[in-house]
């Protein structure tokens, strides 16, 4: 009976990790005057890939307190997607510009209306702090294109998992 109880708890713990990888909503980290946010993590979005992208997502600040994903369509594969960055996607080798935003995340209950980020997006659990405005762009090698990453804070998930492990092996 004790083994069965531990097996059930392990399955519940596994389900916790599986279902915690859901949709997220993002809040701006903005230490500028008037900001109400203090903590955040970093998201990097690559705007170009080996083949020209005709649509992509970018984080956009609406009320200086929150960020939302906005989908931009660009059939000509060149143009201005925000006030500080222009891109020119070409099928030939080139350097890729990156835009960095610093955000924190909380799981949201409803799915966003915009399309998801590229299928090869990765989620990491590192955090840092800075302003929410885009930083100066760095050129990255062409081979690192076609990947976007969103860095989210997973501390609450790991705390629940740790507590579950203590409960699991403590009884």
UniProtKB/Swiss-Prot annotation:
Compositionally biased intervals (Low complexity): 119-133
Which UniProt key words apply to this protein? Cell membrane, Glycoprotein, GPI-anchor, Lipoprotein, Membrane, Signal
Q: Where does the record place the GPI-like-anchor amidated serine lipid attachment?
A: 144
Superkingdom classification of source: Eukaryota
Q: Where is this region: Disordered?
A: 109-145
Q: Which GO terms describe its molecular function?
A: actin filament binding
> Has the keyword Cell membrane been applied to this entry?
yes
Annotated signal sequence is 1-22
- Positions of the propeptide removed during maturation: 145-171
Which cell locations does it reside in? Answer: Cell membrane
Which Gene Ontology CC terms are recorded?
membrane; plasma membrane; side of membrane
As for membrane topology, the entry says:
Lipid-anchor; GPI-anchor
Modifications made to the protein after synthesis: The GPI-like-anchor contains a phosphoceramide group, rather than a phosphatidyl group.
- Which residue intervals are annotated with compositional bias (Polar residues) in the record? 109-118
- Glycosylation is annotated at 39, 95, 120
What is stated as this protein's family in its record?
Answer: Belongs to the ponticulin family.
> What name appears for this protein in its UniProt entry?
Ponticulin-like protein E
* Name of the gene encoding the protein in the UniProt record: ponE
């Amino acid at each position: 009976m004790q083994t069965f109880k531990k097996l059930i708890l392990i399955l519940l713990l596994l389900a916790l990790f599986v279902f915690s990888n859901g949709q997220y909503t993002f809040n701006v980290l903005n230490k500028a005057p008037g900001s109400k946010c203090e903590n955040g993590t970093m998201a990097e979005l690559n705007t170009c890939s080996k083949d020209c992208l005709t649509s992509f997502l970018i984080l956009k600040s609406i009320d200086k307190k929150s960020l939302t994903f906005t989908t931009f369509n660009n059939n000509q594969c060149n143009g201005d997607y925000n006030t500080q960055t222009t891109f020119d996607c070409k099928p030939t080798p080139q350097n890729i510009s990156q835009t960095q935003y610093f955000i924190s995340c909380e799981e949201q209950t409803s799915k966003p209306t915009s399309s998801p980020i590229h299928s090869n997006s990765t989620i990491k659990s590192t955090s840092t702090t800075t302003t929410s405005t885009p930083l100066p762009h760095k050129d990255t090698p062409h081979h690192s294109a076609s990947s976007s990453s969103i860095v989210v804070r997973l501390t609450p998930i790991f705390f629940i998992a740790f507590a579950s492990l203590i409960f699991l092996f403590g009884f």
